[in-house]
Amino acid sequence: MIHRRSLMLASGAALTAPRLATGQTAARMLRFIPQSNLSSMDPVWSTAVIVRNHGLMVYDTLFGLGADFRPKHQMLAGHEVSADGLTWAMTLRPGLRFHDNEPVRAKDCIASIMRWSKRDVLGQRLGVLLNEMRALDDNRFEIRLKQPWAGLAWALGKPSASICAIMPERIAETDAFQQIRDFTGSGPFRFRQDLFRSGDVAVYDRFEAYQTRQEASDFMAGGKPVYFDRVEWRIMPDPSTASAALQNNEADWWEQPHADLLPLLRRHRDIVVDRINSAGNLGVLRFNFLHPPFDNVAVRRALLPAIDQRVFMDAAIGTDQTLSHVPAGVFTPGTPLANDAGLEVLTGPRSLDAARAALAASGYKNERVVMMSATDLPVLQNLAVVAADVMKRIGFNVDFISMDWGTQIQRRTNRGPVDQGGWSAFCTTWEGLDVSVPGSHMPIRGNGANAWSGWPTMPKLEELRDAWFAAPDLASEKRIAEDIQRVVWQEVPFIPLGLVLPPQAYRRSIRDVVKGGPALFWGVKRA
């Protein structure tokens, strides 16, 4: 039996506390403990949540989603769609500037959209439908489509990775498969690259020339007023160190407190423990389709009888069942497209013996399975430990490799075999909003080299995803979602491990925290 407290001690034993940054009064600086080290600063290149969160601070978007998840104008003053739905005419708000004080122009937006369209799951949909984009003048541009797509505004404004970050044309012309090196942004915060120390601190200063909308904040839409001169992300991978910092008023906000420490934090009179992201995070076990053994669908299927989602969730976030939800299928539980089609593969009786027999019959040849594990993210570390244990118990030859999250993000881009630095499997989580519908659900993509890490080729899933885009009503969408789920149980591009419902913790001196999704830093004030 694997116990969570043992996992916590093992994952934190070798970690040391970072030096706390100083230099500004607490009244004008927000001290935030993020979920992990900032491994990349390119919110188009990376799908990591930590990079997306960074991107939402540094870059603005043309549209933003309100609390009702409907797109609203953000950088745009307005837009018009032609009667045939093929031409979208966009007009920028006046006075928009990049962090180098250069004006935001139509051609910057076009270049940014083009780069994003090569990497993002919905951006790729735009790439298929795009006829052309052209600037009409510095403040206006057109997007011309081959066929109507009512979801374009939602895609351009969604807060999920990868965001359509608006950056200067010279930067946006960087190959989408190469990371940018210039972080001149358009958002309410300016990233201080000169003060960044990986594994220690990331610094964001309020961009004084940012033109916030003169209206109330509405999740990712509306005004984005900033009430702090500086936000410091203080990297603390050791949960005990982070907890002590929050209790001792050396930090204001902890994004991902460890479940074992929640009772202690709840008893502290100066700390609020609150769920910010109502949709939660779907845990997934992801496979590499390019190399043995998981290039063999029978090997992937062999794991299904051994997966007990409750065991995974208890290891990840504890036995308090308000912090997780099972069962979980392909789509986020509680959302309109969540369904029970074929779910008995995960909810039926669990059997290690059945899994062993299936693996023996699959043709598995004892190939080495490199399971990557992120030591600085306890939820992911614990999911990986349980997954590796299950694999070993049914007969896999597992090589469990621990690394920090940033290293894992880099390594999972390696498409080579395991003896050339590649990998076989890893565990991660996807935000509930991302995996609530087929359009933004990266783990179900089957478009080969352009798919998410693992790179599966699954024509049937691509066909069903295309059908979902064309669905005339919710009933049709639900039928397609059920078909998608059935195909996932056959192809097994990933295995859902349950829905994590993690709270955040912040000091009572912090108020007006924006709820509904990720940690956001506009509108937040010190009481």
Which positions does each model-derived feature cover?
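Surface-exposed binding/hinge segments that line
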Residues: 125-197
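Extracytoplasmic/peripheral linker and loop segments enriched in polar/acidic and small residues
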Residues: 348, 399-413, 439-508, 527
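Long beta-strand-rich cores associated with HINT superfamily self-processing modules
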Residues: 506-527
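Structural transition elements
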Residues: 189, 322-361, 375-382
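N-terminal lobe/hinge region of extracytoplasmic solute-binding protein
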Residues: 33-83, 91, 114, 184
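Periplasmic-binding protein-like
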Residues: 290, 294-335, 382-383, 488-496
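Ligand-site clamp/hinge motif
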Residues: 212-264, 397
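Ligand/substrate-recognition segments at binding pockets and active sites
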Residues: 238-239, 257, 352, 356-432, ...
